[in-house]
């Protein structure tokens, strides 16, 4: 498997004449910082345009990208200095990934009913992040590296299973626009979060493995944090549009 990964990485080692994986990864740190900052401004500016019961969701979206923007600013500087920003990245994840999971019960309006579900999701998430960190700082390819990586993968799969098997009734009971958004958001957890373990395995690819791993992480963070928030936003706005149309259609009947 290591040989296959090394062969795959070799084809990417030099994207063009002087643009190496290392320099491309550095640029992506700053691009991610800009994307997170722009998304934060957008989410907070648009907060007042969504129905009041969904404004907390927009606040959470803005917090996720705002926290990530700060961390990416710091991580870019650390990477520029020749080190991998592992600690900063995991601090970011331990804060932002639970916030991402909070958005499911918020959008579905589960209230107190969602506390047990949320506690389960957050507990699994923290196990995933903690074990992934231990794997990350272990010797690459060693027994501890693989063992903790596999535990983190199991925790991630349990998060996916929880979202797909314990929220079915709540999704069916939600308005169509919200249920559609939640289904897409589940897809982000299923597919988007799968980029992280793939990126983790890039460390096996040789001299550029660490930079390639960071590149995967950067791309995944932008897709998941910005995209996740935008899906929630457009779902809420679609529902608001339908509710507005229904109110307008009912007004002539009321006046008659």
Regions found by a protein language model. Give the residues of each.
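Polytopic alpha-helical membrane-helix bundles and their juxtamembrane interface segments
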Residues: 2-89, 98-256
């Amino acid at each position: 498997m290591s040989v296959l990964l090394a062969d795959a990485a070799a084809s990417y080692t030099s994207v063009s004449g002087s643009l190496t994986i290392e320099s491309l990864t550095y640029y992506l740190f700053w691009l991610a910082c800009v994307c997170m900052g722009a998304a934060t401004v957008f989410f907070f500016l648009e907060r007042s345009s969504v129905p009041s019961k969904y404004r907390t969701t927009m606040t959470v979206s803005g917090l996720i990208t705002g926290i990530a923007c700060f961390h990416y600013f710091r991580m870019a500087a650390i990477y520029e200095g020749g080190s991998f920003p592992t600690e900063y990245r995991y601090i970011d994840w331990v804060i932002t990934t639970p916030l991402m999971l909070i958005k499911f019960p918020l959008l579905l309006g589960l209230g107190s009913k969602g506390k047990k579900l949320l506690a389960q999701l957050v507990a699994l998430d923290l196990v995933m992040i903690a074990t992934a960190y231990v794997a990350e700082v272990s010797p690459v390819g060693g027994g501890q590296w693989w063992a903790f990586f596999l535990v983190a993968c199991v925790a991630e799969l349990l998060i996916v299973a929880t979202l797909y098997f314990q929220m079915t009734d709540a999704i069916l009971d939600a308005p169509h626009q919200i249920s559609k958004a939640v289904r897409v958001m589940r897809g982000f957890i299923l597919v988007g979060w799968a980029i992280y373990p793939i990126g983790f395995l890039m460390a096996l690819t040789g001299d550029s493995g660490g930079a390639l791993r960071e590149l995967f992480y950067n791309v995944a963070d932008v897709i998941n944090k910005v995209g996740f928030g935008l899906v929630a936003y457009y779902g809420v706005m679609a529902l608001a549009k339908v509710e507005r149309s229904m109110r307008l259609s009912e007004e002539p009947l009321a006046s008659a």
